[in-house]
Regions:
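C-terminal cap of metal-dependent C-N hydrolases
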Residues: 303, 343-393
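Histidine-rich, glycine-flanked metal-binding segment
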Residues: 1-25
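Di-metal (Zn2+ and/or Mg2+/Mn2+) metal-binding site signature of metallo-dependent hydrolases
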Residues: 22-44, 190-191
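Alpha-helical scaffold segments that flank or form the walls of functional sites
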Residues: 24, 41-94, 103-114, 139-146
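His/Asp/Glu-enriched, well-ordered alpha-helical/loop segment
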Residues: 182, 203-214, 250-254, 264-352
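Active-site mouth loops of central-metabolism enzymes
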Residues: 59-75, 124-136, 156-163
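Histidine/acidic residue-rich metal-binding segments in metalloenzymes
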Residues: 103-117, 134-243, 260-282
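Active-site gating loops and adjacent loop-to-helix segments of metal-dependent hydrolytic enzymes
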Residues: 39-72, 148-151, 197-215, 220, ...
Length: 393
């Protein structure tokens, strides 16, 4: 298989597909989603009236007990189909393991195997109700890793006390090193400027030499830190080489809920992280669950929202925007050695309905086709508009 100009003339007896000069990029990477939660927003008892993170966790805790493996898989399949048809071929999903039955984990592990030929999925052992605030949460995380989860998760800002939060961060590092796993922590997902677990996570990962294997998801509190502290923090973040994930639509929805006016946007310092050369990427996070009732798995929508909210409209930023849902996400998943369009790597790519990066962002274009290991996952026919009005043709 080959990509290049005039292949139909070079290989007259071989099927060729004319990309018509459209933009070829690596597949989208969604580095933060919760597949076990998708399409639960309208279930009885799941409605989040305050729109806060903490009510979302409460609603999930109260409704998750009756879920079955088959029901979770049925919902997650819908989300996976949407993400794949929007161009995603790599994904990292958190799965709630504060459930002694491991219902969600078993369901998503089965789906990971079922979909392995069309999308790569990393699974995070995520203690949604706390590693220590939920009795035996640390043991459940460890058991999930033994069962096959790929990544260690935590949620230190949700623990009952600061000390318990710090303990959970250190336990995450310990488990990752013990089982040779990656790390992805829900970190400082709050407007509280005193929530500073990202500092501890960066320090511990740096001192243990695993910064590049570590990710801080959300880090919303960084948007509320005073600049003197943030300036000091950035030195450590650069040293650690830790990754960051921002979820623009989710963060702007959940944060700022305790403000009157002015209201905070609730995102981490994406622009500043990017300008400092610290790896940062965007993600979907939720698809219609107790935290966020909308979402459809289209990362182009996430990118558009993120660039607006983060004041990243400089022309060069727009020209490089796709990095935030492609190469930066791949680095976060630590798959950069096999990801990308290069000789010797799998022929995985998507074709966007645009001629260049700027126009792709400008029009929020769709994906014309997706190719994986040299085979088409799908082709999309161009949009046809039927009109008799000359000015609209």
């Amino acid at each position: 298989k080959e990509i290049g100009p005039n292949l139909s003339e070079k290989y007259k007896d071989v099927e060729t597909y004319d990309l018509k000069g459209d933009l070829v990029v690596p597949p989208y990477v969604d580095p933060h989603i919760h597949l076990d939660y998708v399409y639960t927003a309208r279930m009885p008892g799941a409605n989040n009236g305050t729109g806060t993170l903490f009510e979302g966790i409460q609603r999930w805790s109260e409704t998750k007990g009756n879920m079955t493996i088959d029901e979770i898989k049925e919902r997650a399949r819908i989300a996976l189909k949407k993400e794949i048809l929007y161009g995603t071929q790599y994904m990292r999903t958190h799965v709630d393991v504060t459930d002694p039955k491991f219902t969600g984990l078993k369901a998503i592990m089965e789906l990971k195997e079922e979909y392995k030929d069309i999308i790569d999925i990393q699974i995070i052992a995520f203690p949604q109700e706390g590693m220590y605030s939920y009795k035996g949460g640390d043991e459940l995380v460890e058991e999930a890793l033994k069962m096959g989860a790929d990544v260690v998760g935590a949620i230190p800002h949700f623990e009952f006390t600061r000390e318990m939060g710090e303990k959970s961060v250190k336990k995450t590092i310990e488990l990752a090193m013990k089982y040779n796993k990656l790390i992805d922590v829900h970190c400082d997902e709050t407007d509280d400027d005193q929530s500073r677990f990202v500092e501890l996570l960066a320090a511990e990962s740096y001192l243990n030499g695993i910064g590049e294997l570590t990710t801080a998801s959300h880090a919303c509190a960084m948007g509320s830190y005073n600049n003197a502290y943030a300036f000091k923090l950035f030195k450590l973040l650069k040293l650690s080489k830790m990754n960051f994930i921002s979820c623009p639509t989710e963060n702007i929805h959940l944060q700022g809920r305790y403000d009157t006016y002015p209201k905070r946007r609730g995102l981490t310092r994406v622009k500043e992280l990017n300008d400092a050369g610290i790896n940062v990427c965007f993600a979907q996070d939720s698809i219609s669950d107790p935290w966020y009732p909308l979402g459809n798995g289209n990362l182009m929508n996430i990118l558009d929202a993120g660039f607006h909210v983060c004041h990243m409209m400089y022309v060069d930023e727009i020209n490089n925007a796709l990095d935030l849902i492609t190469t930066n996400g791949a680095k976060t998943l630590h798959i950069q050695d096999k990801y990308g369009i290069e000789v010797g790597k799998d022929a995985n790519f998507i074709v966007l309905n645009a001629k260049n990066e700027f126009d792709a962002i400008l029009e929020r274009v769709g994906v014309n086709c997706s190719v994986r290991r040299g085979e088409f996952l799908f082709k999309r026919e161009p949009e046809v508009i039927d009109t008799k009005i000359t000015l609209l043709k």
